[in-house]
């Protein structure tokens, strides 16, 4: 593979994460305006965004098999057509049913693109370099999560219709579409070059089960935590502005943490540092919940920094449980994480209704403790050390 081809594929991976991050995180910014547009209460409007998450979940799950049937380049180009149709649907229609359908299509497109992006990184890079590259790729999710809410705020403050926010997000896919030209993608399944030696199907091993549980609990814990921090902080007498600042502090330090760990991880055994980070994150979250309001910002900043490498390290370790990275395995771990996203309000909503926001935060803390236990047990069964060959590039 030529160096320019590798750079193009790497940028497609970066942008695939930015696309999903923009779509998922911008929701909170535009929900009120969309509810007004359809003359609906915000609470019932939030349910229609489940179509976005459902689209992401279904496409990540199905793409484990589709990757071997439909070439990656074809998928990305077809995704561009779907993206244009979905954004056009948002702009031209005043129907809630069509809005929900367009959200579902946007979810499908971003899920397919993100699973391809993850697979490309696991395919092109090996050993410790794979972990640091995946981490840097994942930082684009957070970066888009910082940039696009600002874009949305700028447009909405000037009374520009909410659907132009989605048109701006569509520009990310335009860049992906342009990058597919003159770019060779790895061939999979029936399109892969035939080799003399038959491919031996590797068993995944029990380590994948531990990592999948860790992925689900981590995402459910993280989103359950960050979704209820503003309500919890307001309950302690903080202003809405200060409560919102806690959330943006978390994502900012999360992004800086990703950049730092994309360098640091190269020098450590991935399973060991993951166990340390998971334990540290559980302790820091507990300290945040028990802290006085004046100390909360410091705890959430350190929590964001030290927890930033956990999810990507889980995916990387998953990809290293087999000698040859398997798209089905990587997508399985990703799917478990996405299920965590889907369950966020299903799990935390009733807890908050019954016992208040602090109970939701303590539940999230318990989930982080489960992640630590899974990572610790993984140390006894992981196969990544026998497959971990130093990368040549």
From Swiss-Prot:
Source species, domain of life: Bacteria
Subcellular location: Cell inner membrane
Keywords, comma-separated and alphabetical: Cell inner membrane, Cell membrane, Membrane, Transmembrane, Transmembrane helix
Membrane-spanning ranges: 11-31, 51-71, 78-98, 101-121, 134-154, 162-182, 206-226, 245-265, 273-293, 297-317, 332-352, 361-381
Pfam families hit by this protein: MFS_1
Signal peptide: none
Gene3D superfamilies the UniProt entry points to: MFS general substrate transporter like domains (1.20.1250.20)
GO cellular component: plasma membrane
Membrane topology: Multi-pass membrane protein
GO MF term list: transmembrane transporter activity
Main subcellular location of this protein, as a coarse class: membrane
InterPro entries recorded: MFS (IPR011701), MFS_dom (IPR020846), MFS_trans_sf (IPR036259), MFS_TsgA (IPR023528), MFS_TsgA-like (IPR050375)
Family (UniProt): Belongs to the major facilitator superfamily. TsgA family.
Protein name according to UniProt: Protein TsgA homolog
Organism in which the protein naturally occurs: Citrobacter koseri (strain ATCC BAA-895 / CDC 4225-83 / SGSC4696)
